[in-house]
Regions:
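Catalytic micro-motifs at enzyme active sites that drive phosphoryl/nucleotidyl and oxygen chemistry
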Residues: 51-57, 80-81, 86-95, 134-141
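Short secondary-structure junctions
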Residues: 5-9, 88-92, 130-131
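Helical (often loop-to-helix) elements that flank the catalytic cores of nucleotide-handling enzymes
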Residues: 75-85, 105-131, 157-164
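DNA replication initiation on ssDNA origins
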Residues: 1-64, 72-79, 147-148, 153-156, ...
Length: 164
């Protein structure tokens, strides 16, 4: 199975149109009511079209979550050192704009509320309480899709920290 398992009925698309002065990319975003496919992943990895995955699934559970730190320029070394010092099970990846995504990957799917709360505690411990956390939703009403996160490894961008 995929490392980024999520909602099966929808995904996100991000098309870059420009860049702000602070380095954050601007673009057209849309949620597509179709499942994530291998072809979409290939297009993403080849740098053809960005892919977003919704971490909360149809059972209101998650296999992964993410702390999204939007600070430019990002203090990569400082945050990575703190993650190691605290023994947090997080993987640092560059975001599309050069910010930081700290991913938590799980062996089993857990309630989105538990994943969200755990990541809030981790973010606070790292000194970034109040930053964006995925999953954003802890439950989905019928027909809702939730918020998606741009996936890492788009073309030659969004690399894992240490692979810069």
């Amino acid at each position: 199975g995929s490392l980024f398992k999520g909602l099966k009925r929808a995904h996100g698309v991000f098309e870059i149109t420009g860049q702000k002065e602070n380095g954050k990319y601007e673009g057209n975003v849309k949620t597509v009511q179709e499942p994530v496919t291998d072809v979409l992943w290939e297009r993403h990895i080849n740098g053809e079209q960005g892919l977003g995955v919704i971490p909360i699934n149809e059972q209101d559970c998650c296999w992964w979550g993410c702390i999204d730190i939007d600070i430019y320029p990002a203090p990569y070394d400082e945050i990575q050192s703190k993650v190691i010092e605290l023994g947090l099970p997080l993987i640092m990846v560059l975001s599309k704009s050069g910010g930081i995504h700290l991913f938590l990957f799980l062996r089993h799917n857990y309630a989105a509320s538990l994943v969200q709360e755990t990541l809030k505690i981790f973010a606070e411990a790292l000194g970034y309480g109040g930053c964006e956390i995925f999953p954003k939703q802890v439950c989905l009403k019928p027909g809702e899709t939730g918020n998606w996160l741009n996936m890492p490894y788009f073309g030659d961008t969004r690399k894992m920290y240490g692979a810069l």
